[in-house]
């Protein structure tokens, strides 16, 4: 769990709190849920330096069918807030990668993205109809997927959120994508064919490699940390494989 100082005192953003609650609710539905120990220097990072205030707090878990369930909450200089979440499947199981990011500058949500990204060849065909059935018609400011975003499914949702109604609707989309993920994970059976497992490993490695091409992640962190620390954080905490 995130510390009380974050969830009850510092973190007052209602949208992020709603999304956090929803993600945790679905995470709790997974079998054999256990916390993962990570270097504490990378788990909770807080600075009160005037003009450079920041906190980053992470949650790491694993469960049946998932090698890593990661949630990150961050605030930079009191105006930039980020919620980042990736659920990486265990390659023995045919489960997609759940990813969600929200970027909020003051009261403006400049980026909101959620997807169930394929973690094996043709995997998306198994859930494409389910994702396409999620209503996304209310959003007015859809954003273009970057070139490195070929890792996403055809039903990746990426937009700026313009008002309270769109923020509520985004929470609903996330909820439905998570519900689909949980259903898929419940049906998944362990695979023992080494070639199939290796294919899934390669898909996750590529997912991480493509995500690391998103320069915006490092640009934010480099304002507060040196390049060595940033590279280690991205490769160890965010996109390890």
UniProtKB/Swiss-Prot annotation:
It is an enzyme of class 1 (oxidoreductase). The keyword rRNA processing does not apply. Keywords: Oxidoreductase. Pfam families: Fe_bilin_red (PF05996). One of its GO terms (biological process) is phytochromobilin biosynthetic process. One of its GO terms (molecular function) is phycocyanobilin:ferredoxin oxidoreductase activity. This is Phycocyanobilin:ferredoxin oxidoreductase. It comes from Prochlorococcus marinus (strain MIT 9301). The lineage of its organism: Bacteria, Bacillati, Cyanobacteriota, Cyanophyceae, Synechococcales. The gene is pcyA.
């Amino acid at each position: 769990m995130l510390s009380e100082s974050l969830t009850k005192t510092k973190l007052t953003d209602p949208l992020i709190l709603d999304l956090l609650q929803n993600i945790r609710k679905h995470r709790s539905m997974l079998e054999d849920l256990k916390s993962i120990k990570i270097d504490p220097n990378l788990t909770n990072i807080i600075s009160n330096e005037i003009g450079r205030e920041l906190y980053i707090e992470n949650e790491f878990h694993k469960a049946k069918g998932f090698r890593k369930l990661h949630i990150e909450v961050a605030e930079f200089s009191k105006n930039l807030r980020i919620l980042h979440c990736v659920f990486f499947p265990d390659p023995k199981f045919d489960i997609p990668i759940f990813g969600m990011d929200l970027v909020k500058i003051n009261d403006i949500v400049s980026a909101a993205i959620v997807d169930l990204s394929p973690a094996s060849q043709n995997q998306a065909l198994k859930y494409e109809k389910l994702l396409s059935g999620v209503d996304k018609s209310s959003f007015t400011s859809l954003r273009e997927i970057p070139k490195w975003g070929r890792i996403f499914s055809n039903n990746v949702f990426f937009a700026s959120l313009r008002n309270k109604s769109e923020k509520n609707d985004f929470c609903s989309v996330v909820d439905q994508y998570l519900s689909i993920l949980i259903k898929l994970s419940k049906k998944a059976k362990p695979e023992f064919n080494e070639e199939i497992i290796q294919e899934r490993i390669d898909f996750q490695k590529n997912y991480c490699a493509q995500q690391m091409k998103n320069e915006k992640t490092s640009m934010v962190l480099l304002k507060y940390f040196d390049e060595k620390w940033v590279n280690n954080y991205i490769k160890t905490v965010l996109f390890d494989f």
